[in-house]
Amino acid sequence: SRGLGDVYKRQLQGFEKKLDSFLTENSISLSDNQYDALISLSYNIGSGWMKNSALSALLKSGFYSTNELASAMGIWCHVKESGGDYVIHDGLVSRRMAELRVFLYADYSGSSDGFYWVRFVQTEKGDRARDIAFYEAGSTYDPSFDATSNTEVFLGWYTESGELLTDLTATENRTVYAQWESDFYD
């Protein structure tokens, strides 16, 4: 309806104003497609990312790799469950990848092709730096994200089939699990 269209237009104008302020305050220049991608992100998740997030820090610095940017945008793919926990939402994963394609390549097709995700599963023995990262297809998993523990030695990320992840090239979506020294010597 026309009324609903007016509501959406006002919401978008509000996000444009906030993004314009963020860009001006931080002397950031963007291309039209980069601006469009950040408006799409803001419309979906709000403007909180403009405060103290990895994405805002990268944009402020002006120096970032494709994968750093991908993971900084990709981390915004969670929804809150009724119990209060935040979980990865597959639809938002696809949306973030499509926004990346707009930001990086001016590709407005809505496709999420060209990127893969790695999900880092939480373990009881330690903490992980993040629960998901995005990587451009064919690239190396860089930046990489480790797991840490005050009492355990981290041995690496293992696949669902129990094999150490040694091929660090983004060729498919993967779920990996932290393995600890005590897992082998208990």
Model-derived features: positions:
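Short amphipathic alpha-helical surface patches that mediate protein-protein
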Residues: 40-43, 74, 162
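Active-site nucleophile-His-acid catalytic modules used for acyl/amide transfer and hydrolysis
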Residues: 10-53
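Extracellular/periplasmic catalytic domains that process cell-envelope and extracellular macromolecules
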Residues: 30-34, 65, 169-172
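Long, amphipathic alpha-helical surface segments
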Residues: 16, 24, 48-115
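Secondary-structure capping and domain/repeat boundary segments
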Residues: 112-186
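Short, small-residue-biased leader/transition segments that mark boundaries at the very start
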Residues: 2-8
